[in-house]
Amino acid sequence: MQLYVDLQIACSDPNDLPMPASFEKWIEAAILGGSESHREEAELTVRIVDQDEIMQLNHQYRNISKTTNVLAFPFQNPPGLTLPLLGDLIICKEVVESEAKLQGKSLTAHWAHMSIHSTLHLLGYDHIEQAEAVEMESLETKLLTELGFTDPYLSEKE
């Protein structure tokens, strides 16, 4: 599969971010392991932001006035067109770092999890309903394990 990732670093402190190749590896794993495994080409934007920007976007698009770890904006092909665009991912660096520390995970493991999690949202996966959450979390765990990471939900299962 040919993957094009437009990585936009829009956070004030770009230190300790994963390498672009890592984001590409995690995103490709999600696409190939998810509902789009037949896809030959995919294109998406990953924007790494600070809390202010994600809070503004969360309020604007979800009417929720607080930060979140990720926002996913899937692209809808117009009728008659089949473009390789998946959409846009917005990931908040500060929230990812805070969650990793709080959950006792390595920063790299949590970046991988958030990259896979948000890409799956672009592919139509969700976790609002219990059955959907189980399906999505199971797939995330499978993909992360295949990439050498531990189950991101292990502490919740204990």
From Swiss-Prot:
Its EC number is 3.1.-.-. GO terms for biological process: rRNA processing. Belongs to the endoribonuclease YbeY family. Binds 1 zinc ion. NCBIfam families: rRNA maturation RNase YbeY. GO terms for molecular function: metalloendopeptidase activity; RNA endonuclease activity; zinc ion binding. Transmembrane segments: none annotated. Single strand-specific metallo-endoribonuclease involved in late-stage 70S ribosome quality control and in maturation of the 3' terminus of the 16S rRNA. Its cofactor is Zn(2+). This is Endoribonuclease YbeY. InterPro entries: MetalPrtase_cat_dom_sf_prd, YbeY, YbeY_CS. It is an enzyme of class 3 (hydrolase). Pfam families: YbeY (PF02130). Its main location: cytoplasm. It comes from the Bacteria. GO terms for cellular component: cytoplasm. It is found in: Cytoplasm. Zn(2+) binds at residues 117, 121, 127. Keywords: Cytoplasm, Endonuclease, Hydrolase, Metal-binding, Nuclease, Ribosome biogenesis, rRNA processing, Zinc.
